[in-house]
Every structure is written in C-alpha cells, then in structure tokens.
Amino acid sequence: MTSGLILTERKNNVLWVTLNRPKKFNALTRQMFLDLCTVFNDAADDDDIAFVVFTGGKGKYYCAGSDFSPAELSTLTDIQEHGYKLFVDILIAFPKPIIALVNGHAVGVSVTMLGVMDAVIAIDTATFATPFADIGVCPEACSSYTLPRIMGHQKAAALMMFSEKFTAHEAHIAGLVTQILPAATFEKDAKKIIDRYSKLSPITMKVAKELMRTTQIKDELLTVNRKEQVHLNGMFSHEDTIARLTAKFVKPSKI
C-alpha cells in the first residue's frame, strides 16, 4: 500500500508510476520515497511487468524535487535509512527498463535521478534545473558520476555547479533527454512510444540492461550514492546552507 501520493496502474505488461502531489508540484517527501521503494521492489519481482514508466501527475511540474520543508529536513539525519537513499539504491539495481516521462518542469532530484534511468521522454515545454548552489546542497542520486558521463563535464557543471536551467531542447542536445515530444500531442505521442516498447521482447530488454549495467558499474554507483549522501548530510550543518534553506523554504512567523 502507498500513501496515495504515489499512483500505480498496470497497462498490459507496463507499470505506470505517477507522482500525485500537485499542490506541492509533486515534490518528494520521505514517505513518498519509501512508497516508491515498495512499488519498485514489487515490480522487480513481478515477471508480468516488462518495464516501468515514471511520470508526474497533473500540473506544470513533473517534479519539483525533494521537499525541503522543516519537517522533511529533520528526516535527513539518518542517511542509511532515509527513503531517498534507499530508492536511489533500488533504481541502480533495478533489473528492468525505467522510462521517465517528463511531462513538465523537473527540478533537483527529479533531474539527477534521470541519470540512472534508461530513457527520458520529455514534453517540449519542460525545463531542467538543479539549483544546488542556490540552496547550499550538493549533487545527489549519483549525478556526480552519471551526468558528466552523459552530458560532458562542462554541461554537467553548468547544471549542477552553476544552477543553469536547461530547456528540453538543450537537455536533448546534451544527451540527458532521449526524445522531445510537442506539448499539443504529448500524451498521445508518448502512449504510442510506450505501446511500441511494450511489444518488444522483455527478455532482450532485461538482458541488455544487465549487460550494460554490469556488477562493477552497479557497485560504483552504490558507492557514489553513499558518498554523495555523506556530503549532503554534512552540508546541512553548514551556516551557509542553513541560511539559504531557511530563506528559501521557511516562512517567517507572523507576530
């Protein structure tokens, strides 16, 4: 069972996983990460599921990243057991294709997680931003490993060091996005692509992923995920980070 903020629907041999927190732009909470862990673990063991489609619910945002409200920040003290790190570990080891259907703006962890997914189909109005330097945090979800290899060092640095926002077209040129679809026909065109993929050999897709993401690469990614989390946890005690997060996410009290 999930909290209702994560929706799942099986369409033939495809599992659709949808973020369902539109009032908060689908920002991810600790509980949502834990729910995603359950959903993906179950999908990994289900022989009737060929691959997973990961997308956002209604609204202009695919996902606004992690929820950095004070209540959520307080859950980040235990790195090893936090749902966020556990979910990234699951994505790294997930044996079947994961297709990100980016149907709106993507921010923070929703961008960095794309590096451990297998295809990224984006609406042409989407933007991609990782404003780490704006709030005093660091790369996450193995992005310090994956994005320089996907985009090249300078493009990855523009995104993660200098808080540059990428359009869907720019992200496509950089290699982060696999395909761009026009907003006017996005849902119809995306469905056609997913329907075509659903008719492909699930065994071929699974074996191809296993051969591409070797045990050595998985181990490297797991190590990077742990290293990033250690750095991230340490940054939460820095005065600069505290000041930036407070200014961005904490509403001043009304006296």
UniProtKB/Swiss-Prot annotation:
GO cellular component, as recorded = peroxisome
According to the lineage, what is the superkingdom? Eukaryota
Per the UniProt record, one Pfam family is ECH_1
Where it sits in the cell: the answer is: Peroxisome
The residues forming a coiled coil are: none
Record-stated family: Belongs to the enoyl-CoA hydratase/isomerase family.
Name of the featured protein: Uncharacterized protein B0272.4
